[in-house]
């Protein structure tokens, strides 16, 4: 379950969370020395939060649980969050994540979805941005049938609530997800897909920026515009979208810019850990793999024909085989194009 849309306090690494806590409770707080170890700093901060929590400071109680959470002490975090879950939507949200992913406890999808639903429809303004994140995750659960009966119509309804008409403070992930949703054969509406990818891109979504590049390139949901397509793909590629890098390699090749195609394709071939890349770029791993397969296939084509690089058919065969292993379906389409002389 995704918690990446929470604010920096909730999703940060231990050192970032420590800094945030110290800024909140900076009064009477001694500055950490450079020689102070991270463990000592964590212990000092935990003691401070415990003192504040004992006086009834609800924020300190949540932050104490969150500090345990980012330290990987999930059992302790669960106990603290459980005590305040009926009053604090952020704590309830984190409990949902713990049960969904089975962090330090047995996986419980039913309870996770129940808690996420309570956050999504929390009857108070206290929920803030965490409500949008919960709506997004709840929609994802309905789309995939995790903890509930699968329902694409319910997923769509929840994502529309989470997207909030393109509100930049709402769930950008939901906006991007709607763009993907309306691009599926089962719920195809390319004009809606273009609208939502545009909203998400404007709000910073890397994945939607890459998708917009392809929509402009092929005229899907919008008039074909090769300049806008290249602009979106180049910028998304520079920001780290492997999917955009793969398609940009293809664009260069088809425009007979073989040296550029070979250089970018070779770079894409160096990517190995798709899960880590997906996490770092906040993009779906499926599309990271597609980007690598496309870039690798076109680099293999450059090597096979000696375009932009010295001809090396053994190396070309190696990369072509690797590309097929990564994404056989997309490579099958590319092989058909190659057989018909389109590549």
Swiss-Prot record:
Keywords: Cytoplasm, Repeat, TPR repeat. It holds the Pfam family Sel1. It is found in: Cytoplasm. TPR repeats lie at residues 58-91. PANTHER family: LRP2-BINDING PROTEIN. May act as an adapter that regulates LRP2 function. This is LRP2-binding protein.
């Amino acid at each position: 379950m995704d918690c990446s849309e929470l604010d920096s306090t909730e999703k940060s690494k231990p050192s970032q969370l420590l800094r945030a806590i110290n800024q909140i409770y900076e009064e009477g707080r001694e500055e950490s020395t450079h020689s102070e170890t991270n463990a000592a700093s964590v212990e000092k901060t935990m003691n401070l939060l415990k003192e504040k929590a004992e006086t009834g400071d609800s924020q300190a109680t949540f932050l104490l649980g969150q500090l345990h959470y980012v330290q990987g002490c999930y059992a302790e975090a669960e106990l603290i969050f459980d005590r305040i879950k009926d009053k604090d939507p952020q704590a309830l949200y984190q409990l949902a994540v713990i049960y969904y992913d089975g962090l330090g406890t047995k996986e419980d999808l039913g309870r996770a979805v129940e808690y996420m639903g309570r956050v999504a429809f929390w009857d108070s303004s206290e929920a803030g941005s965490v409500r949008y994140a919960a709506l997004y995750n709840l929609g994802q659960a309905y789309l995939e049938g995790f903890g509930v009966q699968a329902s694409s119509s319910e997923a769509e309804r929840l994502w529309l609530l989470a997207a909030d008409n393109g509100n930049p403070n709402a769930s950008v992930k939901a906006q991007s997800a709607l763009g993907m949703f309306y691009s599926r054969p089962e719920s195809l509406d390319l004009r809606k897909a273009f609208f939502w990818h545009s909203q998400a891109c404007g709000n910073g979504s890397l994945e939607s920026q890459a998708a917009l590049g392809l929509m402009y390139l092929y005229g899907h949901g919008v008039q074909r515009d090769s300049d806008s397509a290249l602009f979106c793909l180049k910028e998304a590629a520079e920001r780290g979208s492997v999917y955009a890098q793969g398609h940009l390699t293809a664009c260069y090749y088809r425009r007979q810019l073989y040296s550029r195609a070979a250089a970018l394709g070779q770079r894409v071939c160096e990517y190995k850990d798709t899960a880590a890349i997906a996490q770092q770029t906040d993009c779906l791993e499926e599309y990271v793999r597609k980007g690598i397969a496309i870039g690798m296939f076109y680099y293999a084509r450059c090597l096979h024909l000696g375009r932009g690089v010295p001809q090396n058919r053994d190396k070309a065969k190696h990369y072509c085989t690797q590309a097929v292993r990564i994404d056989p379906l997309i490579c099958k389409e590319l092989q058909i194009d190659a057989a018909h002389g389109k590549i």
